[in-house]
């Protein structure tokens, strides 16, 4: 069965969608412990923009608290704890920044 163009287009558009992220990528300084689960589902911006010069970018964010099990491999002890993760609430296609380009506007020479 062929999926209609409008559905294909809508599903591929820039939007916040459930994405699996590794806890160790979000908390790289916590490498000495093991987390269960090792990744969590959060909303993150992804999708296609109408032009290759644009990138799907978050324009709204909030923090969610998720309960995770932390295991200490040396002592084999475990505990439940709450960890904070960023979720994207709104997304827009914005111009891609070139490598080495400053974040702010460029000053004009005088």
UniProtKB/Swiss-Prot annotation:
Q: Which PROSITE patterns does the UniProt entry name for this protein?
A: PDGF_1, PDGF_2
Q: Which UniProt keywords apply?
A: Disulfide bond, Growth factor, Pyrrolidone carboxylic acid, Secreted, Toxin
Describe tissue expression. Expressed by the venom gland.
Tell me the residues on which Pyrrolidone carboxylic acid occurs.
1
Question: Subcellular location, in the record's words?
Answer: Secreted
Query: What main location does UniProt list?
Result: secreted
Which Cys-Cys disulfides exist here?
14-56, 45-91, 49-93
One GO biological process term is: vascular endothelial growth factor receptor signaling pathway
Q: How does it assemble?
A: Homodimer; disulfide-linked. Interacts with VEGF receptor-2 (KDR) with high affinity.
Q: Belongs to which family?
A: Belongs to the PDGF/VEGF growth factor family. Snake venom VEGF subfamily.
Query: What exactly does this protein do?
Result: Snake venom VEGFs that may contribute to venom dispersion and prey subjugation by inducing vascular permeability and hypotension. This protein induces an increase in capillary permeability after intradermal injection, as well as a drastic hypotensive effect after intravenous injection. The hypotension is mediated by nitric oxide (NO), which is produced by VEGF-activated endothelium NO synthase. Also induces angiogenesis in vitro, probably through VEGF receptor (KDR/VEGFR-2) signaling.
Q: What else is known?
A: Negative results: does not interact with VEGF receptor-1 (Flt-1), VEGF receptor-3 (FLT4), and neuropilin-1 (NRP1).
Name of the molecule in the record: Snake venom vascular endothelial growth factor toxin HF
- Which organism encodes this protein? Vipera aspis aspis
